[in-house]
Amino acid sequence: MTRDQAREKVIFALDSSEFAHVQYWAETLSDRVGMFKVGKQLFTACGPATVRMIQKFGGEVFLDLKFHDIPNTVAMASLEAARLGVKLFNLHALGGYEMMARTVEALDKEFKGGERAKVLAVTILTSSTEETLRQVGIESPVEEMVVRLATLARKAGIDGVVASPREIPLIREACGPDFLIVTPGVRPAFAALNDQKRVMTPAEAVRAGGDYLVIGRPIGDAPDPAGAAEMILDEIMAG
């Protein structure tokens, strides 16, 4: 794997609500990561201008808003996300088949088969455990729910999923090699686990078949963020 190929796999999570931070990170990391993740906090605070700022510096965007509502509302919100020119955005697979299928239908109609944002379905959050699921009435094991939701998403026409790296082999077996897998459960050897339970190192996640790796605090909290990003690329390349 080349360094450019490794770089394309890394998505830096912008864990901030300050617009000035967006410009700083876009300038600092645009040549060291493949994409920037804009989540709920940042997008709520700063809006679409966040996406445009990243694009101004040549960066690609993963809009991580995890849409989950009635089908028409999610489809219309998804159109607005795609019109911003983001590369990836997501919704919750727990919203069901109709919600996901209506979203894909709306996007295909809008973009008429041309290039558009890829839609990802969130399966089970990486902070969740089987006890967490039982507390909300889901008795199935985490792995079983992940595969069930990923399969449902693929059937609805969704482009891929967001899932823990430890579920990658199960998803690959159920959904095939062309189904995108984006994993936030990644921590390099030099970083603490924080609040995510089901994790792997970047090299392990890539070996397992992950297409994109979402990494935030191990880069953003490092004394030398650019250096931390380079260390992660080194680890991916070393395999």
Swiss-Prot record:
Annotated binding of substrate, by residue: 15, 37, 64-73, 126, 187, 196, 216-217
Active site (catalytic residues): 66
Domain of life: Bacteria
Keyword Iron-sulfur among record annotations: no
Claim: Lyase is one of the keywords in the record: yes
Alphabetical GO biological process terms: 'de novo' pyrimidine nucleobase biosynthetic process; 'de novo' UMP biosynthetic process
Any Pfam family matching the protein: OMPdecase
GO cellular component: cytosol
Similarity comment text for this entry: Belongs to the OMP decarboxylase family. Type 1 subfamily.
Protein name stated in the entry: Orotidine 5'-phosphate decarboxylase
Organism: Geobacter sulfurreducens (strain ATCC 51573 / DSM 12127 / PCA)
Gene symbol of the encoding locus: pyrF
